[in-house]
């Protein structure tokens, strides 16, 4: 993959250095193109009208300068999709379709996750600007692109930039696999700054935003960043959605393994819905992270539906 400096076309206007009657016949018609770079800085360049027309460059396009110093459209999305098609595996696509029901079958290319992670590293290294173009593009037509998007977000090292991209991406997540792949490492290092967003996500009525918020509590707030009051956040969720309740049960089962004394009252005092309560006990008893005595005690806390 080639490395480019990527710009966004903000405005295209006529070059006013010559009036219509003053332009010599042998002088090419030019346009003034206003660009912004990935950091938001603005610059203006002159480009031949016919080049802009032939290359179908319009305001809002992502572009780069070719070897002749002329603007060229940056087709990162097409390039990524073509590369993913090259890694397609129909057997794996069939398997993924079974794991994620409700998603249109044609959205699955079947790219394997290890291959996606390797490709994400290559993409981030060779074309950082291209990554930014891709991350600003949603929704994606392919499930594989959503997974790649989540993996790329996980590698962003600046908290504010990562949080902004996550916020923009969350409304487009439509399955548990992409939701659970999205685990930005920078969030673990910034749990205090992240907490207000986690509280907002957990309270969301949208299935996968809520699931993501509970997943953040599970991943980043049961160890050093733990506080007993955080246990109340998932308990306050009232949902009939399987993928929300399943994540809540996983959260409390993990909390039992890591923070038993603070968590067990939620079962002793029936603070959870019956389904989440019993599923929590099931998952905890299947775990190797709690003792046999604890498992036996949990068995006695099961509730009838």
Predicted regions and their residues:
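Short aromatic-glycine-enriched beta-strand elements
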Residues: 16-34
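A generic structural signal for short beta-strands and their flanking turns/coil linkers
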Residues: 3-5, 29-31, 41, 61
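Beta-strand/loop nucleic-acid-binding surfaces
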Residues: 41-55
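Short coil-to-beta-strand transition motifs
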Residues: 1-14
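Alpha-helical scaffold domains
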Residues: 76-305
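Loop/turn positions that initiate beta-strands
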Residues: 58-64
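Short acidic, glycine-rich loop/turn motifs
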Residues: 35-39
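Short, charged beta-turn/beta-strand-edge "cap" motif at the junction between a beta-strand
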Residues: 66-75
């Amino acid at each position: 993959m080639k490395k480019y400096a990527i710009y966004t076309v903000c405005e295209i206007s006529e070059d006013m250095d010559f009036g219509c009657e003053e332009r010599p016949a042998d002088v090419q018609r030019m346009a003034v193109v206003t660009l912004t770079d990935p950091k938001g800085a603005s610059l203006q360049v002159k480009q031949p009208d016919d080049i802009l027309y032939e290359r179908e460059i319009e305001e809002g396009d992502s572009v780069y300068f070719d070897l002749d110093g002329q603007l060229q459209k940056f087709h990162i999305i097409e390039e990524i999709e073509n590369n993913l098609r090259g890694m397609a595996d129909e057997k794996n696509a069939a398997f993924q379709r079974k794991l994620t029901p409700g998603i249109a079958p044609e959205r699955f290319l079947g790219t394997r996750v290890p291959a996606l992670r390797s490709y994400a590293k290559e993409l981030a290294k060779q074309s950082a600007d291209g990554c930014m173009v891709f991350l600003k593009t949603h929704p994606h037509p392919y499930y594989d692109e959503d997974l790649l998007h989540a993996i790329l977000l996980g590698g962003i090292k600046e908290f504010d930039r990562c949080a902004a991209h996550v916020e923009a991406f969350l409304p487009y997540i439509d399955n548990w696999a992409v939701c659970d792949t999205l685990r930005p490492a920078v969030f673990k290092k910034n749990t205090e700054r992240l907490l207000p967003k986690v509280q907002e996500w957990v309270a969301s009525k949208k299935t996968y935003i809520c699931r993501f918020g509970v997943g953040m509590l599970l991943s980043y707030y049961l160890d050093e960043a733990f506080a007993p009051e955080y246990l109340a956040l998932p308990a306050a969720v009232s949902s009939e959605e399987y993928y929300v309740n399943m994540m809540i049960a996983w959260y409390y089962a993990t909390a039992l393994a890591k923070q038993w004394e603070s968590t067990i009252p939620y079962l002793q005092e029936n603070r959870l819905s019956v389904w989440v309560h019993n599923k929590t006990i099931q998952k905890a008893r299947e775990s190797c992270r709690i003792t046999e005595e604890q498992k036996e005690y949990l068995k006695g806390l099961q509730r009838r539906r």
